[in-house]
Protein backbone atom coordinates (compact mmCIF):
# COMPACT_ATOMS: atom_id res chain seq x y z
CA UNK A 1 0.00 0.00 0.00
CA UNK A 2 1.36 3.43 -0.90
CA UNK A 3 2.18 6.10 1.67
CA UNK A 4 -0.51 8.37 0.26
CA UNK A 5 -3.08 5.56 0.40
CA UNK A 6 -2.36 4.88 4.08
CA UNK A 7 -3.21 8.38 5.27
CA UNK A 8 -6.87 8.89 6.24
CA UNK A 9 -9.20 11.55 4.84
CA UNK A 10 -11.02 13.71 7.38
CA UNK A 11 -14.49 14.66 6.19
CA UNK A 12 -15.34 18.27 7.14
CA UNK A 13 -18.77 19.38 8.33
CA UNK A 14 -21.11 20.09 5.45
CA UNK A 15 -19.84 17.22 3.31
CA UNK A 16 -21.87 14.01 2.97
CA UNK A 17 -20.32 10.85 1.58
CA UNK A 18 -22.29 7.85 0.35
CA UNK A 19 -20.53 4.66 -0.71
CA UNK A 20 -22.44 2.22 -2.92
CA UNK A 21 -20.07 -0.60 -3.83
CA UNK A 22 -17.37 0.90 -6.04
CA UNK A 23 -19.38 4.09 -6.62
CA UNK A 24 -18.72 7.03 -4.28
CA UNK A 25 -20.78 10.23 -4.13
CA UNK A 26 -19.68 13.35 -2.25
CA UNK A 27 -22.21 16.14 -1.60
CA UNK A 28 -21.34 19.54 -0.23
CA UNK A 29 -22.26 23.22 -0.37
CA UNK A 30 -20.58 23.65 -3.78
CA UNK A 31 -22.19 20.66 -5.51
CA UNK A 32 -22.12 16.91 -5.92
CA UNK A 33 -19.32 14.76 -7.36
CA UNK A 34 -19.37 11.03 -8.16
CA UNK A 35 -16.56 8.61 -8.99
CA UNK A 36 -16.19 4.88 -9.66
CA UNK A 37 -13.32 3.37 -7.70
CA UNK A 38 -10.98 0.76 -9.15
CA UNK A 39 -12.18 -2.80 -8.32
CA UNK A 40 -8.99 -3.56 -6.35
CA UNK A 41 -9.66 -0.85 -3.72
CA UNK A 42 -12.56 0.14 -1.50
CA UNK A 43 -13.41 2.78 1.10
CA UNK A 44 -14.27 2.46 4.78
CA UNK A 45 -16.05 5.27 6.64
CA UNK A 46 -15.87 5.60 10.44
CA UNK A 47 -16.58 8.68 12.59
CA UNK A 48 -16.08 11.24 9.82
CA UNK A 49 -12.84 9.63 8.65
CA UNK A 50 -12.39 7.80 5.34
CA UNK A 51 -9.71 5.18 4.80
CA UNK A 52 -8.75 3.27 1.67
CA UNK A 53 -8.98 -0.53 1.97
CA UNK A 54 -7.33 -3.03 -0.38
CA UNK A 55 -9.65 -5.71 -1.82
CA UNK A 56 -6.72 -7.98 -2.78
CA UNK A 57 -2.94 -8.18 -2.28
CA UNK A 58 -1.89 -7.52 -5.88
CA UNK A 59 0.76 -4.87 -6.62
CA UNK A 60 -1.87 -3.07 -8.70
CA UNK A 61 -4.08 -2.67 -5.62
CA UNK A 62 -1.22 -1.03 -3.73
CA UNK A 63 -0.62 1.37 -6.58
CA UNK A 64 -4.32 2.18 -6.94
CA UNK A 65 -4.71 2.91 -3.21
CA UNK A 66 -2.79 6.19 -3.44
CA UNK A 67 -4.66 7.22 -6.58
CA UNK A 68 -8.04 6.45 -5.03
CA UNK A 69 -7.19 8.36 -1.85
CA UNK A 70 -6.01 11.42 -3.80
CA UNK A 71 -9.11 11.44 -6.04
CA UNK A 72 -11.53 11.11 -3.11
CA UNK A 73 -9.67 13.80 -1.14
CA UNK A 74 -9.89 16.14 -4.15
CA UNK A 75 -13.64 15.46 -4.31
CA UNK A 76 -14.07 16.31 -0.61
CA UNK A 77 -12.01 19.51 -0.92
CA UNK A 78 -13.83 20.44 -4.14
CA UNK A 79 -17.36 20.29 -2.72
CA UNK A 80 -16.39 22.15 0.47
CA UNK A 81 -13.89 24.86 -0.57
CA UNK A 82 -13.58 24.43 -4.35
CA UNK A 83 -10.64 24.89 -6.70
CA UNK A 84 -9.51 27.87 -8.73
CA UNK A 85 -6.92 28.58 -11.39
CA UNK A 86 -5.75 32.10 -12.24
CA UNK A 87 -4.65 33.13 -15.72
CA UNK A 88 -3.16 36.41 -16.89
CA UNK A 89 -3.11 37.85 -20.40
CA UNK A 90 0.16 39.52 -21.42
CA UNK A 91 0.20 41.47 -24.67
CA UNK A 92 -1.08 44.66 -26.26
CA UNK A 93 -4.82 44.46 -26.88
CA UNK A 94 -5.27 41.08 -25.18
CA UNK A 95 -8.56 41.14 -23.26
CA UNK A 96 -10.98 38.76 -21.58
CA UNK A 97 -14.60 39.18 -20.50
CA UNK A 98 -16.79 36.65 -18.70
CA UNK A 99 -20.38 36.73 -19.95
CA UNK A 100 -22.53 34.17 -18.09
CA UNK A 101 -21.59 30.69 -19.30
CA UNK A 102 -19.13 31.97 -21.93
CA UNK A 103 -15.71 33.57 -21.91
CA UNK A 104 -14.94 36.11 -24.65
CA UNK A 105 -11.23 36.35 -25.48
CA UNK A 106 -9.48 38.90 -27.69
CA UNK A 107 -6.01 37.47 -28.31
CA UNK A 108 -4.72 39.28 -31.37
CA UNK A 109 -6.58 37.18 -33.94
CA UNK A 110 -8.86 38.72 -36.57
CA UNK A 111 -11.83 37.33 -34.63
CA UNK A 112 -12.90 37.06 -31.00
CA UNK A 113 -12.77 33.64 -29.36
CA UNK A 114 -15.96 32.59 -27.57
CA UNK A 115 -15.23 29.76 -25.12
CA UNK A 116 -18.28 27.94 -23.72
CA UNK A 117 -17.67 26.91 -20.11
CA UNK A 118 -18.71 23.37 -19.12
CA UNK A 119 -21.28 22.78 -16.37
CA UNK A 120 -19.85 23.21 -12.89
CA UNK A 121 -17.13 25.67 -13.95
CA UNK A 122 -17.40 29.43 -13.57
CA UNK A 123 -15.11 32.18 -14.83
CA UNK A 124 -14.55 35.65 -13.40
CA UNK A 125 -12.63 38.55 -14.89
CA UNK A 126 -11.58 41.01 -12.13
CA UNK A 127 -9.76 43.03 -14.80
CA UNK A 128 -9.48 42.76 -18.59
CA UNK A 129 -6.17 40.90 -18.33
CA UNK A 130 -7.04 38.48 -15.51
CA UNK A 131 -9.18 35.33 -15.58
CA UNK A 132 -10.14 33.28 -12.52
CA UNK A 133 -11.59 29.85 -13.26
CA UNK A 134 -13.47 28.25 -10.34
CA UNK A 135 -15.21 24.93 -9.80
CA UNK A 136 -15.61 21.91 -7.56
CA UNK A 137 -13.97 19.37 -9.92
CA UNK A 138 -10.18 19.82 -9.87
CA UNK A 139 -9.64 17.99 -13.16
CA UNK A 140 -12.29 20.05 -14.96
CA UNK A 141 -10.95 23.38 -13.65
CA UNK A 142 -7.43 22.47 -14.79
CA UNK A 143 -8.70 21.28 -18.18
CA UNK A 144 -10.58 24.53 -18.84
CA UNK A 145 -7.54 26.59 -17.80
CA UNK A 146 -5.29 24.53 -20.11
CA UNK A 147 -7.71 24.91 -23.05
CA UNK A 148 -7.92 28.70 -22.58
CA UNK A 149 -4.11 28.91 -22.31
CA UNK A 150 -3.73 26.82 -25.49
CA UNK A 151 -5.44 29.50 -27.60
CA UNK A 152 -2.33 31.68 -27.26
CA UNK A 153 0.37 30.09 -25.12
CA UNK A 154 3.28 32.36 -24.09
CA UNK A 155 5.79 32.81 -26.89
CA UNK A 156 9.48 32.50 -25.97
CA UNK A 157 10.81 35.87 -27.23
CA UNK A 158 8.55 38.52 -25.69
CA UNK A 159 6.43 36.35 -23.38
CA UNK A 160 3.14 37.48 -24.93
CA UNK A 161 0.15 35.18 -24.51
CA UNK A 162 -2.08 33.57 -21.90
CA UNK A 163 -0.19 32.21 -18.90
CA UNK A 164 -0.90 30.88 -15.44
CA UNK A 165 -0.25 33.50 -12.75
CA UNK A 166 2.44 31.38 -11.10
CA UNK A 167 4.04 30.35 -14.42
CA UNK A 168 7.58 31.50 -15.19
CA UNK A 169 8.23 32.03 -18.91
CA UNK A 170 11.91 31.68 -19.80
CA UNK A 171 12.67 34.18 -22.56
CA UNK A 172 15.11 33.35 -25.35
CA UNK A 173 17.70 35.79 -26.56
CA UNK A 174 17.15 37.19 -30.05
CA UNK A 175 19.42 36.21 -32.91
CA UNK A 176 22.52 38.42 -33.16
CA UNK A 177 24.39 39.23 -36.37
From Swiss-Prot:
InterPro entries according to UniProt: Ribosomal_uL6-like, Ribosomal_uL6-like_a/b-dom_sf, Ribosomal_uL6_a/b-dom, Ribosomal_uL6_bac-type, Ribosomal_uL6_CS
Record-level GO BP terms: cytoplasmic translation
Pfam family for this entry, one: Ribosomal_L6
A GO CC term attached to the entry: cytosolic large ribosomal subunit
GO MF annotations in UniProt: rRNA binding; structural constituent of ribosome
Protein keywords: Ribonucleoprotein, Ribosomal protein, RNA-binding, rRNA-binding
Keyword flag ATP-binding: no
Statement: the UniProt record of this protein carries the keyword rRNA-binding: yes
Functional summary from the UniProt entry: This protein binds to the 23S rRNA, and is important in its secondary structure. It is located near the subunit interface in the base of the L7/L12 stalk, and near the tRNA binding site of the peptidyltransferase center.
Subunit: Part of the 50S ribosomal subunit.
Membership in a protein family: Belongs to the universal ribosomal protein uL6 family.
PANTHER family reported in the protein's UniProt record: 60S/50S RIBOSOMAL PROTEIN L6/L9, LARGE RIBOSOMAL SUBUNIT PROTEIN UL6M
Protein name (record): Large ribosomal subunit protein uL6
Amino acid sequence: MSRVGKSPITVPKGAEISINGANITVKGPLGTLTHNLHPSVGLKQEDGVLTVVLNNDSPEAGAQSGTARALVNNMVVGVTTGFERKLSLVGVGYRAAAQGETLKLQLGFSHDIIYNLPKGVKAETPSQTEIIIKGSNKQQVGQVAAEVRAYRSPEPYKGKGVRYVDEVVHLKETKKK
